[in-house]
From Swiss-Prot:
Subcellular location: Cell outer membrane
Protein's gene: ssaJ
Organism, as annotated: Salmonella typhimurium (strain LT2 / SGSC1412 / ATCC 700720)
GO biological process, one term: protein secretion
Official protein name in the record: Secretion system apparatus lipoprotein SsaJ
Gene Ontology CC terms, in alphabetical order: cell outer membrane
Family in the record: Belongs to the YscJ lipoprotein family.
Gene3D superfamilies documented for this protein: 3.30.300.30, Hypothetical protein rpa1041
Length: 249
């Protein structure tokens, strides 16, 4: 009797959770809460689960595409930027001046990318700093900066172009304003309408909408369910065996 009950509860759990899929894993607690709140605000059913390596966000499979797109358009999950402690660890061996300069330059790029990513509407930001080059006559070409910003079409990012250039100019000493190049590109909406997706009748939608009634019914009639599942598994096994024999002969 105990074995039957364990099998029944396992099957029941599978039916009630089979339509949920992982959205993101290993998230920090605060970021997971922000993402969950954003999804709930847009009526996307989601839940979080604490794991050993962080928080896992789960959503219904039918809402997976819209959940990913909604978070993407709002810059989630956030990029992890390199810090000076990681670039210059205390136990690091002595590096060449050229390598040290490259690391410092990379940290500057990361710092500017981090500031731009904090702006409302910025999905992704990339910054490249070209260091001065010297010719044979010791004449140095000035530094230049190239910036690429992918932003949400819900925000008029072009209105901030001048302020972004001012921010970059002040972040790099000696940089000429005319040597700053910025390319902005709006992201495309790839969200799907929720209504057409619901026109198809799925038994899992019914189960989710009536979990309490389903649980009571299954607890009252566990054996018919077990017999049905056994027949289903047997039928699947027969089909697999049939196709394997056809491929062999």
């Amino acid at each position: 009797m105990k074995v039957h009950r364990i099998v029944f509860l396992t099957v029941l759990t599978f039916f009630l959770t089979a339509c949920d899929v992982d959205l993101y894993r290993s998230l920090p607690e605060d970021e997971a809460n922000q993402m969950l709140a954003l999804l709930m605000q847009h009526h996307i059913d989601a839940e979080k689960k604490q794991e050993e390596d962080g928080v896992t966000l789960r959503v219904e499979q039918s809402q997976f595409i819209n959940a990913v797109e909604l978070l993407r358009l709002n810059g989630y999950p956030h990029r992890q930027f390199t810090t000076a402690d990681k670039m210059f660890p205390a136990n690091q061996l002595v590096v060449s001046p050229q390598e040290e300069q490259q690391k410092i330059n990379f940290l500057k790029e990361q710092r500017i990318e981090g500031m731009l990513s904090q702006m409302e509407g910025v999905i992704n930001a990339k910054v490249t700093i070209a260091l001065p080059t010297y010719d044979e006559g010791s004449n140095a070409s000035p530094s230049s900066v190239a910036v690429f910003i992918k932003y949400s079409p819900q925000v008029n990012m072009e209105a901030f172009r001048v302020k972004i250039k001012d921010l970059i100019e002040m972040s790099i000493p000696g940089l000429q304003y005319s040597k700053i190049s910025i390319l902005m590109q709006p992201a495309e909406f790839r969200m799907v309408a929720d209504v057409p997706a619901r026109q198809t009748f799925w038994i899992m939608d019914v189960i989710n909408a009536n979990k309490g009634k389903v649980v009571k019914w299954l607890m009252k009639y566990p054996y018919p369910l077990m017999l049905s599942l056994t027949g289903l598994l047997l039928g699947v096994g027969i089909l697999i065996g049939y196709f394997c024999l056809r491929r062999r002969f």
